Amino acid sequence: MTKLQHPIVIIFGAGASRGGLDKVPGVPPPVDRDFFDIANQLVGHGTPKLTKKVLNDVWQLYSRTNGIGLETYYRELETRAIIGEFAKTANQPKDWGRRQKDLEELIRRVYVHTTVFDTQAVTVNPKKSEIHKKILEKLEPKDIIITFNYDLVIEESFSSARLWNLIDGYGIQTSGKTKGWAKRWLSDKEYINGEKSKISLLKLHGSLNWKSYNGTTIRLKPKPYLVSTRKGKIRFEKILILAPGWNKRVDKNPYKKFWREARLQLEKCKTLMILGYSLPETDLLAHSLLAEVVRTRAARDDFLKQLYLADPNESVKERFVELFTPALGPHGKVFRYHDVEEFSKKIYE
């Protein structure tokens, strides 16, 4: 394989989490198009009850549940809720806000159930992705990870805290490191007190383990994998994420900070790896971010040296090649792989 040129930016999409855990026992993490199919396979802690409720809502809109993508349905709820606020019906309105709330909790639960071995266990055991581990081991100081995923597959796949840690590695300071999940992570990864992260993990849509933001720091959840009921009722947990709607407020912190840093790093990296990310047509903000990166790099003749693409869908890879062609210049190299597993094997050759 051609020698990797650093600094590297890696973009992990939902397909990377799916591919990384696909051969691990249990239900795999979803991609957009099969989210509701995956949700319908989950058991325990009131999740089937919530899934049934959400699927009934989906059926009411489309007269089917199969083939309805998560983003399609969420955007439908979001836009109808907005219409209902200013163009009120003379008849009995639907409670679109309730439907959004139910779906957001189901999203959280699906990503918990599919990334741990047993949600019923006293101590939750997260699944490990050997594929992610191999990829992360190739990174060097000043490389950057960008993801639109909420799950913690990347965090759990670091073999140690040598390159990255959860205290300062998210591109923002965090609090809550002495409790629960964060305490366990730091211990398992043999974190040395005071050691700084050498790479950043920019989670542009938020994370399962983020509880709140106070203007300067993100508070980590002590139990990000918690799914439970209380007195027979489904327990809803608050997390800091941007739901998959059209109105993502990336212009507000902490997301504003992450998107700004992502753009700066994409504009100066030598190598870009896009793994399991399909750049859906509905994600206009991501389209604009990448289009602006291509425009500025082409205008400065600051071309990418290497572009790595891993996705089973050939049309997805072609879409990225077409998008990045102006930023590759006459000598940029493009490498295509069927999936993240093939990619993780080839980068060691």
Question: What is each of the regions a protein language model found here?
Answer:
Residues 124-131, 178-189, 245-264:
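A Trp-anchored, charged/polar loop motif used as the substrate-binding/catalytic surface
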Residues 156-159, 212-221, 284-287:
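A short secondary-structure junction signal
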Residues 161-175, 276:
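A short alpha->loop->secondary-structure connector
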Residues 48, 52-54, 213-267:
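Acidic, metal/cofactor-coordinating or nucleic-acid-engaging core segments within structured domains
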Residues 207:
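Carbohydrate-associated surface elements
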Residues 1-20, 29-33, 45-46, 248-349:
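SIR2/sirtuin-family catalytic core signature
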Residues 1-166, 343:
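Gly/serine-rich nucleotide phosphate-binding loop at the start of the catalytic core
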